Structures are given as structure tokens and as C-alpha cells.
């Protein structure tokens, strides 16, 4: 059951975010770490040791950690053979293939329209500008978790390809074998639907590995896995901690947290639709967040009833039973303006505007990973087929971060090509600033090019 909050109590509890470093680690996870390492250590230290070992021993360490943590067969190939990719695509049922093809096409067409080009000007005494260059090699982490996510392959790989990245690499955890009881892979094989998605968009370099060890391999490289320039993709706590620790040696897209959605709805919204949208996000995992903001108590109570009714027939009700009372709820606001204010405070990954005039309300929104305008632009379409990538900032980072886009897969090189006259004119200014900073060698370098020399 979704709890109904007033604004003040929501500010004190539901809308209050914990700092990223205050992640609550379940006791079962600490027990597993202790069993693996033979001592009681936290996840940060565990990840640090794994990364250090991968960096020092390469493939040998990668295989050992994959076997210890994921029961990965010691004789299984790390890289998925091309024939296995093609076979997975050929075996994909036609309805699923058609859906993925349409999704890939829409994603590609969306990102082809994103401006991305070098530029130059001759108005400042020569030629100044910026070269836009694609990254050469990127690694995409595709989580398996509670379900395989072929959509994440499309939403990450296609923007990279549009940006011109030459080598797009996918890593994904192998599947659990029947009866393993581990929740982790022991077959040595990635879910076929993920492989099919890779083949569909032309990704040919795919590795069966997950967790911190996969991030370490991508960041530092091993004998079998060449290092990448930047790592993308969400994952569990260990993946997130690993990305944080390798940053600097390699680029990262960000630190993904549990998925979250916020719905602002007025009295015109349909309770059943609003409830369905909240449940769609809350079913992701037990830490997912789904919050409704509305000035209508009548709607709030109707949605509360609908959530309970629809939940009864959903197969992931066990997850919903934890995520709904945990980080989700309904907040009664004074009006839509206050709802927009609370949204900007929370900065959600997804914001759905189920109101009579979503365009007017969107003018008051500053912080959100993506805005879904009206009841017909519901968030699930954004998850799969609308066009923009579903990889969006979480944990309040929508205050300063953006959804995944082609700019994440390029870097900018500044160009300076001044003519002699301009150089002679501005070199004395550079020398003056350099001497003010106490950098005499800088100043003398400028003096050689000044008009007086």
C-alpha cells in the first residue's frame, strides 16, 4: 500500500536523500563478502582488492574472481564467439526481433538529430575552434540482475555508434545455471536476448563477465580484454563502487543508483493509468522509488486503491511489497506550482506530467533526467521505444547531470591557430598576466613573440 504524505512530512522523510557514501549494506551482503575474503570487510575494500588484483595479474585474476563470485567455469571463453551472437539473433522470436528493430531505429534517428560537429572562427585574428572527436573504444556494462535488459544494449550502443565510436564493447554477467541457487552465473553464457540485441545493432565484441572484475578489466585491460577509454552502464553496488574507484584511469558516464520516477498529476488524470506507471518503475528492484505529487486528494486516494488492486496480479509483487512502502508514496501538494518545486528539490530520473497542460507546467521544471508529457507519453515507452536513451541520471544527480547522449561518446580538442599580427598584439598581455602570477618563464616565452622582439 502506498502511504499518503503531507508536504512537510515528505520533506523530512520521503524526499530526503542520503549522501552517496551512506549506502546501507544488507547483512547478507556483508556475510557473503566475509565468506569470499575470509575476513569482515566492507564493499569498498572488497572492490579495491579485486581491482588491484585485476590490474596486477590480468586474465588470471579476472578468471579467478569470476569463478569465485559468479561460479564462472574456468574453461569457458571470456569473449563470446561471433557464431553465438549470430545464433542468438537467428533464434530470437520474430515479434521480439521486430520490437527491438523498431526501438533501435527510433533511437538512431533521435540521436542523428543531435547537433555534433566541429566548428571554427576566423574573427579573432587567425583560426580558433573545436575539433569534435569520437572516443576510440568504449565499454558498455549491461546488467543481468533480476532480469536481462536487451534495451540497455540498444540505449547505450546506438548513441555510441552515431557518435562515431570505432570499438563498442559490451560486458554482461553470465546466467545462473538451473539449480545453482547462487543468483549468479555458472553457465558461462550471457542471456541469449542480450546477445541477440548486440548482434542486432552490430556489436561484435562481447565478454561474459560482470561485477567489479568486469569494470577492472575494462579500465586496466588484460591479455584478453583490451582497455577502453570510457565505461558506461548501470550495475549493482559493486559495479558502482568499482566505477568510482577506476575513474581517472578511465572515464565513466556517472554513478547509477536505483531507478526512480515522479508523477505530477491533477484531477484530470486517470487513477488506473497513474497507478500503472508507478508500479512499472517500482517493480525494478526493492530500492526503486515511485512518487506521486498531486493537489487532488480524491485522485491520491483513488491511485492508492488502484495500486493495491493492480499489484495483486503482478508477478513481481514480492519486490513491490518492499519498494512501495520503502521509498515510494503519494504527496498531497497545495497546487501544481508546489509540486514542481518539490520535483526540482528531488531531481528525479523520470518525471511524468499527467496534467491538463503539461507544456505549461514543464516551464517550471529545472531538474529531471527526462520529462514525459501527458498520459500518452508514459515512461515505459521511454524505457524501450520512444527514442531518447533510458540511461538517465539518478540519485538527485539530475541537478547537474544529463541523460546519456552522443556528447558522452566524444571529446573536444581546442584549436588555436593565430596569425603573426594577432600574436604580436596579445603576447604582451599574456606576459603581463604571467608575471602577475609569478611565472617568469611563461612571460619570457610570450616576450619572444611580442611586437617589440
State where each predicted segment sits.
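N-terminal Rossmann-like NAD(P)+-binding subdomain of aldehyde/semialdehyde dehydrogenases
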Residues: 1-136
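Conserved NAD(P)+-binding/catalytic subdomain of aldehyde/semialdehyde dehydrogenases
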Residues: 200-289
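Short internal beta-strands
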Residues: 166-176, 290-297, 374
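General beta-strand structural signal in soluble alpha/beta enzymes
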Residues: 119-122, 140, 170-172, 205-211, ...
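Conserved small-residue-rich beta-alpha loop and adjacent elements
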Residues: 120-192
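C-terminal core of ALDH-fold dehydrogenases
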Residues: 344-453
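A glycine- and small/hydrophobic-rich beta-loop-beta segment
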Residues: 280, 284, 292-368
